[in-house]
Structures are given as C-alpha cells and as structure tokens.
C-alpha cells in the first residue's frame, strides 16, 4: 500500500498502521509504503487507513498493489560495506576484514531476505547493549532471529548456547547458513515458528528485535522464560512507543534497567522485579 504522506508524519502513522496489522514499512520523502500479507487485507482495513489519513488532514487516496515474493536484498547486498558497531565488525562474506578493525569481533552476515544486517538502528542498539549482559556460558533465546546476527554476537561474546526461532521461512535457511559461517552452529538450535516452539525456561538472556505489536504479545512468555537474574533486551521500537512498552512490561513484572536511542528508534534492557 502506498500513501501520499510527508516525511514528518511517517513515524506516528507507522505506529497506527502497525496496530492495524501492517508488518513492514518503506519510507520515501513524500510517501510511505506499508506491507501486510494479502490474506489479511480487507475493505475494513482500507477504510481504517483512509480514516487515519483524513484525521491528519491528508487526502485519503491510497494505492494498493499485490506483489510477488522477491529477494529484495539481492538488489543492494553487493553495495554492503563492513560496519563497526561497538566491539563488533559486521561484514558480508565477500568483504575482507579492514586492517583497522582487526581486533574487532567479526560477524559475517549475508542477509538474503532476512532482517538483521547492522545497518538498521534497531539492530545496532541491541548489539551495543549485548556486552553488558552476556555472561560466560549464558543460555540465550533469540526471538525473530532473522539473519541470526544477535545470536551470533551473543555466542561470540561467550554465551554457551542459544535457541533461535523465526516464523519467516527465509530465516530458517539464512540464519543457519550464517551460524555455520561464523562457527557457532554447534551451539545454536534454530526452530521454525513462534514462541510455542520453545517450551524451555531459565534463559539468562532473551533477545527480540521485532515490532511493538508482536513484542507485547510475547512479553508474558518472556517473563516466564527468563531467569530471575537474567535480562530481556527489546528493540524494533519507535521512541513514541516507549511509554506503552514500559507500561506493558511493568504489567508483567519487568522493569527497565537501561535504555538507548538512535534517531527515531528506542531499545530497552529489562529485568524481572519478582
């Protein structure tokens, strides 16, 4: 769906569109593209979007298209350059490690169609938090692992084992390729699906870089699965979503002990209160 929206209104509209079930967004200077599975598109959704536009004083004209699955990352992955984030150097497999970063922890990530390259603020925010909460031998749960970058980073910092899950079929292949490429495949188990595929508890660290609606749904399970001394790291959130997210966390006995922002994005480190 393509909306004629000025850039200043993108962030508040993304929050409201997310609540309607849209799962991905692409921003351009004078328009906003929003994506949802075709099976979920209804006339009621169209009318709700038009109402949002009218309330912002905008024309309620929208353009809707059905698109076929495509490996969008193939268009730009050849342009990916190594990037340093905290103690990490993130690079695609076809780039050598620049000499200036020889002492960094290398995360070799080929993205394909999965999310998590280090080029998005939400990924960088969690990577920067990780060194403060990964204990030697820690058990890690990575929700919505995407490329597997957060799992790989945690294991390279000294975590002992990880379970990584994702509902996206592309992630199943991509994450496992990246686990093998980074030499951590023997310490991580990938599972296809959502939180129901993880009956285990007592994780030292839970990682989730997903949009707010899904995070709110997963928080009760995160509270049950994290150790009393463990950490829950959340990202994929806009600054405007902070208060709602903290209220939801508090309702599940989770409190913030560290927060970080970059541009419009916000991330938080939570611990159990009881």
Where are these regions (language model features)?
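SAM-dependent Rossmann-like transferase core, predominantly class I methyltransferases
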Residues: 70-136
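S-adenosylmethionine
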Residues: 133, 167-274
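N-terminal auxiliary segments of SAM/dcSAM-dependent transferases
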Residues: 1-100
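Short beta-strand micro-motifs in enzyme catalytic cores
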Residues: 1, 32, 105, 266-268
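Conserved SAM/SAH cofactor-binding pocket of Class I
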Residues: 113, 117-202
């Amino acid at each position: 769906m393509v909306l004629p929206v000025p850039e200043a209104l993108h962030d508040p509209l993304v929050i409201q569109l997310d609540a309607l079930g849209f799962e991905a967004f692409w921003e351009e200077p004078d328009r906003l593209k929003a994506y949802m599975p075709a099976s979920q598109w209804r006339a009621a959704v169209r009318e709700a979007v038009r109402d949002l536009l009218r309330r912002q004083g905008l024309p309620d004209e929208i353009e809707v298209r059905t698109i076929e699955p495509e490996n969008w990352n193939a268009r730009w992955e050849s342009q990916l350059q190594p990037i340093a984030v905290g103690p990490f150097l993130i690079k695609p497999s076809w780039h050598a490690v620049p000499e200036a970063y020889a002492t960094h922890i290398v995360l070799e990530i080929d993205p394909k169609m999965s999310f998590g390259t280090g080029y998005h603020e939400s990924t960088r925010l969690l990577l920067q938090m990780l060194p403060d909460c990964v204990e030697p031998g820690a058990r890690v749960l990575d929700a919505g692992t995407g490329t597997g970058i957060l799992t790989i980073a945690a294991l390279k910092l000294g975590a002992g084992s990880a379970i990584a899950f994702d509902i996206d079929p592309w992630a199943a292949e991509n994450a496992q390729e990246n686990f093998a490429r980074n030499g951590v495949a023997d310490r991580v188990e990938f599972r296809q699906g959502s939180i129901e595929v993880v009956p285990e508890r007592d994780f030292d660290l839970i990682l989730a870089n997903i949009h707010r609606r899904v995070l709110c749904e997963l928080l009760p399970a995160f509270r049950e699965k994290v150790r009393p001394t463990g950490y829950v790291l959340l990202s994929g959130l806009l600054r405007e979503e902070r208060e709602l997210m903290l209220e939801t966390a508090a309702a599940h006995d989770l409190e913030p002990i560290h927060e970080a922002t970059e541009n419009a994005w916000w991330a938080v480190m939570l611990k159990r209160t009881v």
